[in-house]
Amino acid sequence: MSFRKKTKQVKKVNLGFKIDCSQPVEDKVILIGEFAEFLKSKIKVGGKLGNLGENITISNDDKKINVQSTIPFSKRYLKYLTKKYLKKQDLRNYLYVTSSDKNSYQLRYFNIQQDQAE
């Protein structure tokens, strides 16, 4: 009697996420290439850093970062890494991450109102 080993088949999923950094890039607060490299080095696949392989591709335009994945990938994890980058660059007090639609995030400035009367 021979025993066959059951293999798990991973679903092929095509996911695409975008991070719109247009406001901070126009103000030259964030370098988009540096942010893309940060994501490439910090995304974990299979519990290992930088193990992207062909499963996850990260590309950047002038003001946007595109993340394409063929394995299950959480949008929330992308938000976590974005917040981690902002904290590392000491920008967390000025910028926040918000969801603009189902597959994208946007970096925005906090609205700081100063009292002009004083």
Swiss-Prot record:
One cellular component (GO) term of this entry: ribosome
Biological process according to GO: cytoplasmic translation
Gene3D superfamilies per the UniProt record, alphabetical: 3.30.1360.210
Annotated keywords: Ribonucleoprotein, Ribosomal protein, RNA-binding
GO-annotated molecular function: RNA binding; structural constituent of ribosome
Classification via Pfam families: Ribosomal_L22e (PF01776)
Family the entry assigns: Belongs to the eukaryotic ribosomal protein eL22 family.
Protein name (database record): Large ribosomal subunit protein eL22
Organism lineage: Eukaryota, Sar, Alveolata, Ciliophora, Intramacronucleata
Gene: RPL22
